[in-house]
Amino acid sequence: DYPGFASKGAYPIFDNVAAIFSATPGITRTATYLFACTEWVEDAFRGRELLHDIYSRLMNPTSVSLANHIVDLECGAEANQYMAWNFNSGMAAIDGILSHLVGRDDIILSSRNIYGGSFQLLHDWYAKSAKLGVALYWFDGYDQKAFSIALEEVKKNEDERLKMGRKILVYLESPCNPHGYVLDVAGISRVAHQ
């Protein structure tokens, strides 16, 4: 039981105005919003007024409520220090994270057993020289030993990039799609952070 945790049993207290006194949040089923004046439009698009929604694919009361509730569940008393983002698909989430972290000429070391869409994104976008020119490596195996061997090989092969300040990013999916293999994420993470 966390102080300040906005929940009563299985029913959270929603920050969604339409859900006041409701057991579940209201679902916003619109793509566009009306504004009373042009000043409100400008405030919304410049981020000065967070209660003015612009377009449902950007943000809407339903997705904001979901994100805030996830933060409450995950962070408890420290929820006010965190935020969450919702994505409409797993691929959107993967690309959102990668496009934020990966820079031109960086290095990605990925487990070989990943979803086909993830493979295409890494191979056909990030690794293309006309795009980001990322050096893409794959490792077989499921534990920290297999990963450690692959990481040392990548460091040896990409010595020049590393000297230029490029970073190695590790991409894992576990359980792996489509076979369901489970990786030793904790062990691989320990090696990656050494």
Question: Residue spans of the language-model regions?
Answer:
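ADP-ribose/adenylate-binding Rossmann-like module
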Residues: Q194
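Short conserved active-site loop signatures built around small residues
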Residues: D1-T28
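Basic, Gly/Ser/Thr-rich N-terminal segments that form RNA-phosphate-binding interfaces in CRISPR RAMP
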Residues: Y181
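Solvent-exposed alpha-helices and their adjacent loops that cap or buttress functional pockets
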Residues: V17-S22, A77-A79, H100-L101, A130, ...
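Conserved N-terminal alpha-helix of the aminotransferase class I/II PLP-enzyme fold
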Residues: G26-I27, T32-A92, G96-H100, G117-Y126, ...
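PLP-dependent aminotransferase-like
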Residues: V102-S174, D184-V191
